[in-house]
Amino acid sequence: MIKASAVAALATATVPTQAQLTRAAATRGYKIKNKRIRQSIMGWTFNPMPTDELIATCVDIGLTGIEGINRKFYPAARKAGLEISLVGSHGFGKGPNDPANHTMCIEKLIDGIDVAKRFGAKRVITFVGMETPGIDRDQARVNCVKAWKKVIGHAEKNGITLCLELLNSVDDSHPMKGHPGYQGDTLNFCIKAI
């Protein structure tokens, strides 16, 4: 439905594994050595750690990028040599699945694209949005595509990829372990949308 070059990625969360370092091990001078995998970090998950300290830690251990931080820290992250891995736009709560949100989503996506261009980032995140009474999955998908088509040219012109995030709606044991009611919660839905 939309050019794959502009909406090419589904952002997915990673699950911690036994192979990951403990916090204590990471503080003993751990450094990524061979750089076969370019790694970045989701900043908000380290709250309440100060962002400037997080940026310095990312550089110290050899990460290449950071995302999920307040935009006011982008200049410091770039100066430290980190990429901005993903620029935010509208949140996941109010998405383009509901036409009532289109103006806001489009404005925030265009702003995200402009910010990404300014800071040398290559990706901006978008979401589907929470389920809205009276809007089924098929209509939600059509609504999303209508909104995304209004920003896709701007993204392509600036060399920015829009990344559609698929969020889990099943696990509701903690506010950030699931997103009950999120409409873009299946790979099938998201693939059909892009």
Where do the protein language model's features map onto the residues?
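N-terminal export signals
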Residues: 1-21
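Active-site-proximal flexible loops/turns
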Residues: 10, 74, 172-173
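C-terminal segment of N-terminal export signals and the immediately downstream linker at the start
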Residues: 15-49, 57
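Surface-exposed charge patches
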Residues: 30-32, 56, 75, 114, ...
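Structural motif corresponding to the early beta-alpha repeats
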Residues: 45, 61-152, 156-161
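Acidic/histidine-rich catalytic cores of soluble enzymes
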Residues: 55-59, 145, 149-194
